């Protein structure tokens, strides 16, 4: 056997996220300024990666919205950084959009304790993911977004395969090309950010791109569900002084009411900015405004169009 053949047999194939980033080679010899500049330049890649998958994001948003309007729920599932990003995005939905905590849920291998401690040994156990979904009564009505930078994590792939088997909507988010991981879901979003500054540390560029994609997906879905008017969070949960000030500001800007009136409206509506706005803009009483909102499926703009039509 030739030396060439011997050499080729010893070559290790590394998936994209495990490859060496030549621009950050000898990183430990760099000055602080050089390190920061390397990071700054590398962090342009996540934005480019997101721009390349805009069609897939649009498809995902529309399909998720359709499922949620039909009493479905949205689940994120992942391990390590990927799991933490899913839990983070899900946990922001109730305070930002006043959603029921059951509507958008994040599942991380190992449960809540894995948010602060490593549970990497669970990444390779696909059966646990299936059990985690069954514990939440996951059904064909629901949506599963499996987050796996490598596109290979057994825990995530097991969850996606189970979801497909019961006809739930399945979406994957990975950071590798098809040659590194063959995924076959309803929608596969590949955020190609290239080798990491620290080889294999996908909490960096891959994680940043994933966070950007999740921001776009969840926020866009909530807009489609009527949780936003203009660019204002009209379904926010008024749970502290900062959010109370924000709610008053929204009523002042859109409803053209002063601070005293805004506070009175929020008291009447148990802190509902959306309902308070409808009352301020239409002159309706609480009961009639609430009924109109229900008839308009919670969409303030639709409700206001109906008021003008009458």
From Swiss-Prot:
Coiled-coil positions: none
Active site: residue positions: 92 (proton donor), 123
Keyword annotations: Carbohydrate metabolism, Lyase
Catalytic activity: N-acetyl-D-muramate 6-phosphate + H2O = N-acetyl-D-glucosamine 6-phosphate + (R)-lactate
SUPFAM superfamilies: SIS domain
Pathway linked to the protein: Amino-sugar metabolism; N-acetylmuramate degradation
Domain SIS: start-end pairs: 64-227
GO molecular function, one term: carbohydrate derivative binding
GO process annotations (BP): amino sugar catabolic process; N-acetylmuramic acid catabolic process; peptidoglycan turnover
Pfam families, A to Z: GKRP-like_C, GKRP_SIS_N
Entry EC number(s): 4.2.1.126
Record note on quaternary structure: Homodimer.
Job description of the protein: Specifically catalyzes the cleavage of the D-lactyl ether substituent of MurNAc 6-phosphate, producing GlcNAc 6-phosphate and D-lactate.
Miscellaneous field: A lyase-type mechanism (elimination/hydration) is suggested for the cleavage of the lactyl ether bond of MurNAc 6-phosphate, with the formation of an alpha,beta-unsaturated aldehyde intermediate with (E)-stereochemistry, followed by the syn addition of water to give product.
Family: Belongs to the GCKR-like family. MurNAc-6-P etherase subfamily.
Protein name: N-acetylmuramic acid 6-phosphate etherase
Species in which this protein is naturally found: Prochlorococcus marinus (strain NATL2A)
């Amino acid at each position: 056997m030739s030396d060439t053949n011997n050499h080729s047999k010893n070559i290790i194939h590394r998936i994209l996220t495990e490859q060496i980033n030549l621009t950050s080679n000898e990183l430990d010899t760099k000055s602080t300024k050089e390190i920061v500049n390397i990071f700054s330049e590398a962090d342009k890649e996540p934005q480019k990666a997101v721009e390349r998958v805009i069609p897939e994001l649009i498809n995902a948003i529309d399909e998720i919205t359709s499922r949620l309007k039909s009493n479905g729920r949205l689940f994120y599932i992942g391990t390590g950084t990927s799991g933490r990003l899913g839990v983070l995005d899900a946990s922001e939905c109730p305070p930002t959009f006043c959603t029921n905590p059951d509507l958008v849920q994040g599942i991380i291998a190992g449960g809540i304790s894995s948010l602060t401690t490593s549970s990497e040994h669970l990444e390779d156990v696909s059966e646990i993911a299936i059990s985690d979904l069954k514990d939440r009564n996951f059904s064909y009505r629901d949506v599963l977004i499996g987050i796996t930078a490598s596109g290979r994590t057994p825990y995530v792939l097991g969850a996606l395969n189970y979801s497909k088997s019961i006809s739930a909507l399945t979406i994957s988010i990975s950071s590798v090309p098809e040659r590194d991981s063959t995924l076959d879901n309803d929608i596969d979003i590949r955020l190609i950010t290239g080798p990491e500054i620290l080889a294999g540390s996908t909490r960096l560029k891959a994680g940043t791109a994933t966070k950007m994609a999740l921001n776009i997906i969840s926020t866009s879905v909530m807009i489609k569900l009527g949780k936003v008017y203009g660019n204002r969070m009209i379904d926010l949960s008024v749970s502290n002084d900062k959010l109370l000030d924000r709610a008053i500001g929204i009523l002042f800007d859109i409803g053209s009411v002063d601070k005293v009136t805004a506070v009175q409206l929020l008291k009447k509506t148990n802190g509902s900015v959306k309902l308070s706005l409808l009352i301020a803009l239409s002159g309706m009483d609480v009961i009639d405004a609430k009924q109109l909102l229900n008839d308009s499926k919670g969409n303030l703009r639709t409700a206001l169009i109906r008021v003008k039509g009458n």
